[in-house]
UniProtKB/Swiss-Prot annotation:
Similarity-based family: Belongs to the glycine-rich peptide family.
Miscellaneous field: The peptide Ctenidin-2 corresponds to the shorter peptide indicated as conflict in the feature table.
Positions bearing Glycine amide: 138
Role according to the record: Antimicrobial protein with bacteriostatic activity against the Gram-negative bacterium E.coli, and very weak activity against the Gram-positive bacterium S.aureus. Lacks activity against the yeast C.albicans.
Major subcellular site: secreted
Name the record gives this protein: Ctenidin-1
Organism for this UniProt entry: Cupiennius salei (American wandering spider)
Tissue-by-tissue expression: Expressed in hemocytes (at protein level).
Subcellular location: Secreted
Keyword Signal: yes
Amino acid sequence: MKHLIPLIVMASVVLAVYADRGYGGGRRGGGYGGGGYGGGGYGGGGGGYGGGVGGGRGGGGGLGGGRGGGGGVIDGKDDVGLGGGGYGGGLGGGQGGGGGLGGGQGGGGGLGGGRGGGGYGGGGGGYGGGKYGGGKYGGK
């Protein structure tokens, strides 16, 4: 059992590096909360398709896991009010926060974690997080 721990740690680091580079998924939150279905694969969250100022749910899937929350000031049909919410899963897991003009924080947890969100756009976490989950206008 002890010899498995270093292997798990090394694999986590490698995957986190690839995730931060956007491997298998978008790094950008996108516009004012809209734009594309981000995420997927190892790269994790980002994107969102709800439109509006705070809007939409983040992408996700694969090992990156998770769906970002988000409120949607204009289009909130698929969301959980202004406070956001959402849920995750997979190795990257975590919850996406956000919502409203203030955005908030994306999820995290799992082996990599990290924070998305912030600014107008919100965003997701994903496996290994990533530096580009937030930003004033939903991601850079």
